[in-house]
């Protein structure tokens, strides 16, 4: 908003300065020049020349002594602009050429490709459940009878305080016994260490007897309180109003069994590819098929150790199977 107001004020100032410079506010009005005649040659008629009227010159009246009021805007505009003296000027007729250019618009072709949109509409069977309304019965508010208890105030009981006489304790001074200092002998250590025992003189302290003062038994004044009887108020039994509720019957709506559309799927056949088993081209090392009456096996040096291990495993399994008896704590031979 501030920018627009500032630009408007600047524009008004510029227009006022331009009017003062040209003298349009106080001088002659602008002269109007007549438009030139246009001659057009017809195609069939003879050529005719048309003459235009000479331009008429209009003279301005002598300048009057009317002065413009001084401008209220900054003094820079008024100081630099001078009013020109009005002189009669004759303007020549100016002919303007108008050239019309042929504008060719290019035809713009827009390609509109509409895609076929397929919408799937699935209609689902909606079953509305019947709304069951429950009847609510409002209970009448039950007021309870309030009974006020009688408050009994107790009489304040004053206690008698007895001050005890201060008892002075007899102080007995203990006899201090000084111990004789024992001199220790320093022995130089040799390869064999000699150990000497020093006996310390022990002084027995005399038992100190403390003076015992017997205190006189202090008797406290006992005041018997009168038994306070409390007023007992029997409350009347409050009977509550019992309202029997009518059994509410719920509307049972039987739903129609909904049948689901079962679509049978066509059995899909899987392409079965038979794997080609590569048969060994080299003859295996070993014996011919086992059985009685066959040829004896000469053995295979490459597989002897493996065959022996397998035979040992089979023998151990057979032995464990024979030892196993259900329910026995140990293996049986």
UniProtKB/Swiss-Prot annotation:
Superkingdom of source: Eukaryota
Keywords: Repeat, Signal
GO cellular component: extracellular region
Biased composition (Basic residues): 89-277
Low complexity composition bias: residue spans: 74-88
Signal peptide boundaries: 1-23
Region (Disordered): 51-285
Compositional bias segments (type: Pro residues): 60-73
Protein's GO biological process: puparial adhesion
Protein name as catalogued: Salivary glue protein Sgs-3
Annotated organism of origin: Drosophila erecta (Fruit fly)
Source taxonomy: Eukaryota, Metazoa, Ecdysozoa, Arthropoda, Hexapoda
């Amino acid at each position: 908003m501030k920018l627009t107001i500032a630009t408007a004020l600047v524009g008004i100032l510029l227009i006022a300065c331009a009017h003062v410079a040209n003298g349009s506010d106080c001088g002659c009005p602008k002269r109007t020049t007549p438009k030139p005649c246009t001659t057009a040659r017809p195609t069939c008629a003879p050529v005719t020349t048309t003459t235009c009227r000479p331009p008429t010159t209009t003279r301005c009246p002598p300048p009057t002594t009317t002065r413009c009021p001084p401008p209220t805007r900054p003094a820079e505009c008024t100081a630099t602009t001078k009013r020109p003296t009005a002189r009669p000027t004759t303007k020549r007729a100016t002919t303007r050429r108008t050239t019309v250019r042929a504008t060719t618009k290019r035809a713009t072709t827009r390609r509109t490709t509409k895609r076929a949109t397929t919408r799937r509409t699935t209609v689902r069977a909606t079953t509305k459940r019947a709304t069951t309304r429950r009847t609510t019965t409002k209970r009448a508010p039950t007021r309870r009878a309030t009974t006020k208890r009688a408050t009994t105030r107790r009489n304040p009981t004053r206690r008698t305080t007895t001050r005890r006489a201060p008892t002075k304790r007899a102080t007995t001074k203990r006899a201090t016994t000084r111990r004789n200092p024992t001199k220790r002998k320093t022995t130089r250590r040799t390869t064999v260490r000699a150990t000497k025992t020093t006996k310390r003189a022990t002084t027995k302290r005399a038992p100190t007897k403390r003076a015992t003062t017997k205190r006189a038994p202090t008797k406290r004044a006992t005041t018997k309180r009168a038994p306070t009887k409390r007023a007992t108020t029997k409350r009347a039994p409050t009977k509550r109003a019992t309202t029997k509720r009518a059994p509410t019957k719920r509307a049972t709506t039987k739903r129609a069994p909904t049948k689901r559309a079962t679509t049978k799927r066509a059995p899909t056949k899987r392409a079965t590819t038979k794997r080609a088993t590569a048969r060994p081209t080299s003859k295996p090392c070993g014996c011919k098929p086992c059985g009685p009456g066959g040829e004896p096996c000469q053995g295979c040096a490459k597989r002897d150790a493996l065959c022996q291990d397998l035979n040992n495993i089979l023998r151990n399994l057979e032995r464990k199977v024979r030892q196993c008896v259900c329910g026995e704590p140990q293996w049986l031979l």
